[in-house]
């Protein structure tokens, strides 16, 4: 009996509870955490408050968290705080920067616990962790999808030399209920709902881009963290709602170059409410046209062999953004500058081993 109790206790131990931070951008009280309490309470939360820093954000009791507002961001980063968006959920990437954990899970505050087809609550975090801890298959598509899941395997004809897979850098989760639409689609399909639950996880093939959504996303911070910059969006910028997609395009180019994998599929969350399509259209208007230039840019982007770290890859991408997308609109020159500033800020707060960080400055070796 004692051994079965011990086994039950071991099974209930949260996976990676000391190695994972949950990052939540918000402008409101976080009552939604009550629904997530059984799954999130053992973890450390990093809350990034957008908007008015004088506003008080209420967090339910019993959660271990840090909360950063705009004043904190300015204090910690100094002049480099200019790279962190204001009045846009892109501010969440500040949480990635200040975290000291190996893994990050980020979720929006309008996302609730979904149920699987049997009616059981879905532990989204547990599935993301499984996705990240198992390899990806970016170099050859497996028709049974993720061969490392229980009940699946490599199919006949899958090269034996590729069956070890590649390290998984990103786990991109999905959603039920309110779709993740652009504003024009939102306007013509106001009653559409995502109701189809697909029990699958797959690796996005090398050379294929995808529209990354930040509302239910996990990643290995050690492998890809510096590439998870959600751009310069929102207040004072000519574009919004492209923050997660920008990060996804940059990340995919870099993971392809470094031989890392990106998974999409399970887990699902319940997206509870639609944002205003007219407000969204104003934010997205330029992006709707610009993306016709952005997609070919990322599809043809190539990184040199010398770019052997995420930071080097990202700085090279920033150069290419300036050289090629700067012709599309002057905003992209500003964005390229912010990409460089982001890497400087990342290295400021995350100095290489053997170096110490100086306040609002570069790292100096001991």
From Swiss-Prot:
What is recorded on activity versus pH?
Optimum pH is 6.5.
Looking up Pfam families in the UniProt record yields:
RGP
PTM comment: the record says: Reversibly glycosylated in vitro by UDP-glucose, UDP-xylose and UDP-galactose.
Please tell me one Gene Ontology term that the record gives under cellular component: cytosol
GO biological process terms, semicolon-separated: cell wall organization; plant-type cell wall organization or biogenesis; UDP-L-arabinose metabolic process
Which UniProt keywords are given for this protein, alphabetically ordered? Cell wall biogenesis/degradation, Glycoprotein, Golgi apparatus, Isomerase
The subcellular location is: Golgi apparatus
What is catalyzed by this enzyme? UDP-beta-L-arabinofuranose = UDP-beta-L-arabinopyranose
Q: Location of site Required for activity?
A: 156, 163
Q: List the disulfide bonds.
A: none
Please list the residues annotated as glycosylated: 156
Swapping residue 163 to A leads to an effect described as: Decreases activity 50-fold
Effect on the protein upon substituting residue 156 to A: Loss of activity
**Cofactors that this protein relies on:** Mn(2+); Mg(2+)
Q: Where is motif DXD motif found?
A: 108-110
- Where is this protein chiefly located? Golgi
- Give the Enzyme Commission number: 5.4.99.30
MF terms per GO, please? intramolecular transferase activity; UDP-arabinopyranose mutase activity
Q: Could you give the domain comment from the record?
A: The conserved DXD motif is involved in enzyme activity.
What is said about its interaction partners and assembly? Heteromers with UAM1 and UAM2.
Which family does the record assign?
A: Belongs to the RGP family.
Chain's role: UDP-L-arabinose mutase involved in the biosynthesis of cell wall non-cellulosic polysaccharides. Catalyzes the interconvertion of UDP-L-arabinopyranose (UDP-Arap) and UDP-L-arabinofuranose (UDP-Araf). Preferentially catalyzes the formation of UDP-Arap from UDP-Araf. At thermodynamic equilibrium in vitro the ratio of the pyranose form over the furanose form is 90:10. Is probably active as heteromer in vivo.
Question: Which protein, by its recorded name, is this?
Answer: UDP-arabinopyranose mutase 3
Task: Name its species.
Answer: Oryza sativa subsp. japonica
Q: Lineage of the source organism?
A: Eukaryota, Viridiplantae, Streptophyta, Embryophyta, Tracheophyta
